[in-house]
């Protein structure tokens, strides 16, 4: 049953990539190290996945969304529509270069950590960065010596601080 009033404690969610699931590498990592991070499997196109996310977070404010690749695109789109509900975004090689994405008219004010791999050929930093800068007012960028999967950079992030 959903709460009668939106929650005020931060609630963290992991949004997986297009070809991944909650049981992928990052999902398993969260299950082991931060089991309170909520996740589910998303299916369909961007709008269908956003509708699934809307259902998942119904009645919850103070959201921390960590999204990988297409999940990062989902997090950015959700934040553009509901910026008042966002505490923080952690965008991991987000697919902001996909044609489905347009920066919001008013940049999202919540803190955003954008982590990209310098060797990412799926979501190259030179294509993602301009859209990120147009989308987020409080943006921190980390470009790591990594590829799209961010297997080295991902576990090295300060997750205890990011998830509070």
Where are these regions (language model features)?
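A conserved short beta-strand
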Residues: 84-97
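Catalytic histidine neighborhood in serine/cysteine hydrolases
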Residues: 133-150
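Short beta-strand immediately N-terminal to the catalytic nucleophile in serine-hydrolase-like folds
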Residues: 65-67, 92
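Short beta-strand/loop motif that positions the catalytic acidic residue
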Residues: 108, 113-116, 120
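Active-site catalytic motif of lipid deacylating hydrolases and related acyltransferases
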Residues: 2, 6-61
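Post-His helix in hydrolase/transferase enzymes
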Residues: 151-164
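Conserved alpha/beta-hydrolase "acid-adjacent" motif
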Residues: 23, 121-127, 151
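Gly/Ala-rich beta-loop-alpha elbow adjacent to hydrolase catalytic centers
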Residues: 67-76
């Amino acid at each position: 049953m959903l709460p009668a009033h939106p929650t005020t404690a931060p609630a963290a969610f992991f949004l997986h990539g297009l070809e991944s699931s909650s049981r992928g590498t990052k999902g398993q990592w969260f299950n082991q190290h931060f089991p309170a991070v909520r996740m589910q499997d998303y299916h369909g196109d961007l709008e269908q996945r956003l509708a699934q996310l809307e259902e998942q977070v119904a009645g919850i404010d103070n959201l921390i969304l960590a999204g990988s690749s297409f999940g990062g695109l989902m997090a950015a789109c959700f934040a553009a529509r509901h910026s008042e509900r966002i505490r923080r975004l952690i965008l991991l090689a987000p697919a902001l270069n996909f044609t489905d994405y347009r920066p919001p008219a008013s940049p999202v004010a919540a803190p955003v950590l954008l982590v990209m791999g310098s060797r990412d050929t799926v979501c190259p930093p030179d294509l993602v960065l301009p859209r990120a800068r147009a989308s987020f007012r409080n943006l921190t960028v980390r470009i790591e010596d990594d590829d799209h999967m961010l297997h080295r950079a991902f576990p090295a992030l300060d997750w205890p601080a990011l998830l509070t």
